[in-house]
Swiss-Prot record:
Protein's organism: Helicobacter pylori (strain HPAG1)
NCBIfam families for the chain: S6
Function text: Binds together with bS18 to 16S ribosomal RNA.
Entry keyword annotation includes Ribosomal protein: yes
The protein's name in its UniProt record: Small ribosomal subunit protein bS6
Stretches with biased composition (Basic and acidic residues): 110-133
Keywords: Ribonucleoprotein, Ribosomal protein, RNA-binding, rRNA-binding
UniProt cross-references to PANTHER family, sorted A to Z: MITOCHONDRIAL 28S RIBOSOMAL PROTEIN S6, SMALL RIBOSOMAL SUBUNIT PROTEIN BS6M
InterPro entries attached to this UniProt entry: Ribosomal_bS6 (IPR000529), Ribosomal_bS6_CS (IPR020815), Ribosomal_bS6_sf (IPR035980), Ribosomal_S6_plastid/chlpt (IPR020814), Transl_elong_EF1B/ribsomal_bS6 (IPR014717)
Superkingdom assignment: Bacteria
């Protein structure tokens, strides 16, 4: 399975029940095709960067999931034929570095410290420890 992120923007004219229904529909598309949703972010109503189909606002939803590449075409097809979807994007994370970034995004969405941040903090701690040692050696030699 590959790592993906999808975001879609729904029309602002939908009522809460319709929004929930659309979100559940797309989540089911992923899971029915043996995908696994790791986490999702319900970002709510936001201003659009530019007007889309005469709308200045839209309802944003993001999901991070693992799935087989074959189901992505079906997901995109279903986005395209739904007139309530203003915009959508599906991003595939391929390289080791991209997959690490995907995990960091999932951790952030789940409010956990990310793997990448832990690595960075470890490196930063080691680096500052070496600087302290170098400074103490430098001050002793004077």
């Amino acid at each position: 399975m590959r790592h993906y992120e999808t975001m879609f923007i729904l029309k602002p004219t939908l009522v809460e029940e319709e929004i929930k229904s659309k979100i559940e529909f797309y989540k089911e598309v992923i899971t029915k095709h043996h995908g696994v949703i790791e986490t999702s972010l319900d970002m709510g109503m936001r201003n659009l960067a530019y007007e889309i189909k005469k709308h200045k606002r839209g309802y944003y939803y993001v999901a991070y999931f693992k799935a087989e590449p074959s189901m992505i075409l079906e997901l995109e097809r279903l986005y395209r034929i739904n007139e309530d979807v203003l915009r959508f994007i599906v991003i595939k994370y391929e390289s080791k570095k991209e997959v690490e970034a995907w995990h960091a995004l999932v951790d952030r969405a789940n409010k956990k410290p990310s793997h990448a941040k832990e690595k960075h903090e470890k490196t930063e701690h080691t680096h500052s420890h070496h600087l302290e040692e170098a400074e103490s050696v430098g001050s002793h030699s004077e």
